[in-house]
Amino acid sequence: MKLSGVLLLAIVLPLAFVSALATAQADGDIVVQSIAEAEVEVINRDGRKEKKREPVALAVPGSQVIYTTRFTNKGVKPAGNVVIDNPIPAHTVFVSGSAFGANTAITYSANGGKNYDLPGKLRINIPGGAQRQAEPRDFTHIRWRYVGELAPGKQGEVGFRVVIK
């Protein structure tokens, strides 16, 4: 079954300019669920400070948002070739080194998702016809390629952090 589990899911925060659109492709029935969270400091039962994630209620310039996409194989067969693509929302900057995802190969795009590669290999055009190495602030998309097959009923999780401009 090719691409039978493609699902688009948008997360729109109260600030209309902050959004993410995750897509999943696979040989199987993959369902994705995305969430935008902020890390907050709370006092636990022992009176100690600890960090906790909560859904974003308000994102203001300078604040950090964590985008997480959970993907689940809802089919009866293992799903292969699982790929999660996520654009970096407009008016945000990717936090270098923040992309995560167990059992995934992570690549980036600096040209609107046309091409993906490792950060050190990405180049962007600059005025005058020259090129320079892309920096995290230039990244437009992140791609996670799940390594191996995702068993029926199993779930994976990928994500990244951004700072609101």
Show where each model-derived region lies.
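N-terminal secretory signal peptides that target proteins for export/translocation
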Residues: 1-2
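Exported/extracytosolic protein signature
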Residues: 5, 21-165
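Bacterial N-terminal signal peptides
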Residues: 8-17
